[in-house]
Structure formats: structure tokens, C-alpha cells
Regions:
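Helix-coil modules at protein/domain termini and other flexible surface or pore-lining loops
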Residues: 1-185
Length: 185
């Protein structure tokens, strides 16, 4: 673990963690115990989703989940891939078990949704080529992991609103970012 210096007096330091064997970098803002714990959590989250996803069998979307969820996944994959709905509906995806944030029940989902490597679900990459860990969380407590997942999900939705609208609710002063007119405490 390393602590990176501040970019300027108003910016926080960063707690950074690297795993040279697995090439899994992670970081969090700050140098408090909470930020160090955050960096460790990010590290385990990335390590898990890059290196430790173990898939189950292969199933179609309608074999692994309720019809309403399968329909939603079909529409999402249709929007982000160049495949037809029929190709999506008939494809057998590698599966993993996950928690549904809305019902808190376990269900199977396509492994390509959470596996960040290009090997685990190689045959499924054409359906979901750009992946991240949005809505995923690592924690020693199941309840805290679910809460973290919900926060990750809300963070993504907020970023999407910002990107789609092209404006933020609050503008950060350039004087704060550059350190101009900074008064030390």
C-alpha cells in the first residue's frame, strides 16, 4: 500500500493498493482509516471481479431468471450489442449467482455482467463488451455488501444523469481547485 501526495493543498491524498501478481490496482481518497479500508475494499472488489468469478452452467436468460427480468436483460443487451433479439434470447450464457438489489433474493445472472476479465465468459462478450463493477460491492458483512452495492448503483445513476444532461448541479470553483486564495487552517 502507498500514500500518494496531494495534487494541491485542497485535494486529498490517496491510499493506493497494488497486487503485482494479479495486476489489480485500487485506491481511495484520503489517509484516514476509513479511506484505507475503502482502498482495501476496492482492491478486493477488483481482484474478485477480475480473477475469481467461478461460473455455473450455461443457460438462456429465460432459463436463469423470471420472464420480466429476462425481457429486461434482452432489451439491455439489444441496446448495447449489434445482435438481434432472437440471438440474445436463444444464446446460452455462462451463469453466476448474485443478489437482486430490489428483492434481496439470490438469482442467476449472466457471468459477463460481473466478470471483468476477457476469459471467464469469452463467448458472451459480444453481448456485453464494456463491463465494470457498477452495483457490485465487497464487504465482510452481507448487509454492508448489499448497502455498498446500492450506493454503487446510485453513484452510477448520478453520473449517468450528469453525462446525459451535460451539466452538474454544483459547480466547483476554480479558485479552490487551483489553490488560489487558499487560507491555511
Amino acid at each position: 500500500m502507498a500514500m500518494s501526495p496531494k495534487l494541491n493543498r485542497n485535494m486529498p491524498t490517496f491510499s493506493q493498493i497494488w497486487d503485482y501478481e494479479r495486476i489489480t490496482p485500487a485506491s481511495a481518497a484520503g489517509e484516514t482509516l476509513k479511506s484505507i479500508q475503502g482502498a482495501i475494499g476496492e482492491y478486493f472488489e477488483r481482484r474478485h471481479f477480475f480473477n475469481e468469478i467461478v461460473t455455473g452452467g450455461q443457460k438462456t436468460l429465460y432459463e436463469m431468471m423470471p420472464p420480466s427480468a429476462a425481457k429486461a436483460f434482452t432489451e439491455a443487451f439489444f441496446q448495447i450489442s449489434s445482435l438481434t433479439r432472437d440471438e440474445i434470447i436463444t444464446h446460452k450464457f455462462k451463469t453466476v449467482r448474485a443478489f437482486n438489489l430490489f428483492s434481496l433474493e439470490q438469482q442467476e445472472i449472466p457471468a459477463v455482467i460481473i466478470a471483468l476479465d476477457n476469459i471467464t465468459a469469452a463467448d458472451d462478450l459480444k453481448f456485453y463488451p464494456d463491463r465494470d463493477t457498477c452495483g457490485c460491492s465487497f464487504h465482510g458483512s452481507l448487509n454492508d455488501a448489499i448497502e455498498g452495492s446500492l450506493c454503487e448503483f446510485m453513484e452510477r445513476q448520478s453520473l449517468l444523469l450528469y453525462w446525459l444532461q451535460g451539466k452538474a448541479n454544483t459547480e466547483i470553483s476554480s479558485e479552490i481547485v487551483t489553490g488560489i486564495n487558499h487560507i491555511d487552517e
